[in-house]
Amino acid sequence: QNALHVIGKKENTIIAYTRIFKPGDYFKEASIGRVVVSEKSRHLKYGHLLMKASINAIEISFRTNKIKLSAQKYLEKFYNNLGFKIVGEEYLEDGIPHIGMIKN
């Protein structure tokens, strides 16, 4: 699998990161995974900027706007605000409640 990496840096330190995958690598749709923002940077809204950059990278690199991700349940509203909608049932991944979400 070949991921593209979206990296956010501040003062030469990585503070935000995602991996993006072309359609068919994980899901039928393009996908975003491993969304991480350093704890001390979360209040600065870098998660929103990181996701916007990741969505844009998928649209440019893979020429699609249909994107799927596996979200931790407590972040459902965050992803809703970015245009993602729930698909399927809640499930556990590593003991943490998750939900599938798609953006069209």
PLM region spans:
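Conserved GNAT acetyl-CoA-binding A-motif
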Residues: M51, I58-A71
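Conserved short alpha-helix immediately C-terminal to the canonical SAM/SAH-binding motif I
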Residues: L50, L75-F78
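A conserved beta-turn-beta hairpin within the catalytic core of GNAT-like acetyltransferases
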Residues: P23-I32, R42, S61-N65, G95-H98
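Conserved acetyl-CoA-binding loop-helix of GNAT-fold acetyltransferases
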Residues: V37, H43-N56
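Conserved beta-strand in the GNAT
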Residues: I7, T13-K22, E29-S31, V36
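Short secondary-structure junction/hinge motifs that connect adjacent elements
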Residues: Q1-H5
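Residue-level recognition of the GNAT/N-acetyltransferase active site
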Residues: S38, Q72
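Conserved catalytic-core motifs of GNAT/GCN5-like acyltransferases
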Residues: K68-S70, N80, K85-G100
